[in-house]
Amino acid sequence: MSEIREMKFTDDLPTWAELRHAVEASDADAPRRWGSMSAPQMLRHVNAFCGSYMGEIPVSFPIRVAARWLGKFFLNRVARKSPLATPKNMGTMPALRQAPTVHPNWSEELAQFLSYTEQFEAIEVAGNPQKHPMYGEMSARDFSGLLRHHTAHHFHQFGLLSSAPKRLQS
């Protein structure tokens, strides 16, 4: 087994505790700054993303193959950017898209998100390498860090997080 090289994330990447605090201080009526999702749809999207990392959402073979070939380059570029600098309105895997006609229950999505934060925080603390359904084996820090990055991007979309410096973590 080869050594897993860790990604460099910016210093403004929030912890799971900071993400929990941000979402618990918000509500279903949080106004979006861009995009088309409502706050409950965003939280369901974030939960679907978390579920995909846990293997709860199937990933098609062609997407897995493409992700294994190109994913690490893409992920390293994303990790080096602040969640504030992540491009808006990027393409989303169909299984993770939120239909505009679906109106999720904020409280249910919040409970699911809080449960996921506990699971991913425990994974990060344990430090055991993880098998990502699309990108293959990666460190627990990267596995969790990519999720925190994605979540922070969407929390910024709804003004749930304030901006911070963009220095790289070692």
Language-model segment annotations:
Residues L19, V46-F49, E109-Y116, L147-H150:
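Alpha-helical packing segments of well-folded alpha/beta enzyme cores
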Residues R20, E24, C50-G51, L114-E121, ...:
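Structural signal for well-ordered, non-membrane alpha-helices
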Residues S2-K8, E56-E108, Q112:
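Short, helix-capping/interhelical loops that line the mouth of catalytic, cofactor-
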Residues F9-W16, R32, S36-P40, A99, ...:
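Amphipathic, non-membrane alpha-helical segments in soluble helical-bundle scaffolds
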Residues H21-A22, T86-N89, A122-A126:
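Short hydrophobic/aromatic-rich motifs at helix boundaries and adjacent loops
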Residues D29-P83, V125-S170:
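Short, contiguous alpha-helical
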Residues M1-E24:
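Extreme N-terminal tail/first-helix region
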